[in-house]
């Protein structure tokens, strides 16, 4: 996991050099008005929902999600933002049988998390169509990572207390207290310009984290997906 995140950061840092030449981009509209790109700060505030991949029904794995970010646009193509995302993830079972003839077991649980991180952002509209400050729609792809701080995992521990053989229910990574784990993520932002300073944003991101995140052993990383809207 850490190796993948380091490689991701290294590749993104190389991209800074390739986009730096575009930092002084200019644009002239049909009326002859000339615009010069200026480096600038930006702020994102978003809310939406999360789907945590698991064995429960789809609806039982949905939870509210919130994200805030502050970033800097270095060039028409490249930007960097620090973001923080949370606040719940979910897990569970839907008609799960520990043995072939066992009784179907259905339950769900949630826990809290806060995940600060850094995203390397690439404006695809400016990359392929050139910089245009009056463009109504922009698509931006991003990759990044950070630290996931998780806690309040009592619900699954309460369920486990009534399960005789926890390993049969995949609960080999049951945890309590607070856990800090690295994560990597990628996603896309779709921005609709409302004014010179404000855009409506739709975002989707996929997050990869340790297999231990949802307390279950699956021999592969855990995933959660966020769908967000904001400004």
Predicted segment positions?
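Transmembrane beta-strands of outer-membrane beta-barrel proteins
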Residues: 41-45, 80-82, 116-118, 137-145, ...
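Short glycine/proline- and aromatic-enriched beta-strand/turn motifs that initiate or cap beta-hairpins
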Residues: 23-71, 152
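Short loop/turn motifs that connect adjacent beta-strands in outer-membrane beta-barrel proteins
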Residues: 24-40, 77, 126-139, 194-197
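Predominantly the C-terminal beta-signal and adjacent terminal strand-loop region
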Residues: 93-95, 111-113, 195-231
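Gram-negative (and chloroplast) outer-membrane scaffold detector with strong preference
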Residues: 78-164
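Residues that define the transmembrane beta-barrel architecture of outer-membrane proteins
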Residues: 39, 60-66, 110-116, 137, ...
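Residues on the lipid-exposed face of transmembrane beta-strands in outer-membrane beta-barrel proteins
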Residues: 45-49, 68-72, 118-124, 143-147, ...
């Amino acid at each position: 996991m850490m190796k993948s995140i380091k490689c991701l950061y290294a590749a993104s840092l190389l991209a800074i050099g390739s986009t730096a030449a575009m930092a002084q981009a200019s644009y002239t509209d049909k009326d002859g008005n000339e615009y010069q790109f200026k480096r600038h700060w930006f702020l994102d505030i978003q809310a939406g929902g999360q789907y945590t991949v698991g064995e429960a029904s789809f609806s039982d794995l949905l939870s509210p999600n919130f994200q805030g970010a502050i970033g800097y646009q270095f060039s028409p193509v490249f930007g960097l933002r620090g973001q923080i995302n949370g606040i719940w993830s979910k897990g569970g079972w839907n008609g799960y049988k520990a043995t072939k003839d066992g009784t179907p077991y259905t339950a769900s649980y949630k826990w809290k998390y806060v995940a600060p991180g850094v995203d390397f952002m690439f404006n695809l509209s400016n990359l392929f169509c050139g910089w245009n400050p009056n463009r109504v729609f922009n698509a931006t792809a991003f990759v990044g990572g950070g630290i996931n701080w998780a806690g309040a995992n009592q619900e699954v521990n309460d369920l486990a207390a009534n399960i005789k053989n926890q390993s049969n229910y995949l609960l080999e990574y049951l945890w309590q207290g607070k856990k800090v784990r690295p994560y990597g993520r990628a996603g896309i932002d779709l921005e609709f310009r409302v004014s010179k300073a404000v855009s409506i944003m739709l975002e989707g991101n996929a997050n990869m984290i340790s297999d231990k995140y949802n307390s279950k052993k699956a021999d592969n990383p855990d995933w959660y997906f966020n769908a967000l809207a904001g400004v």
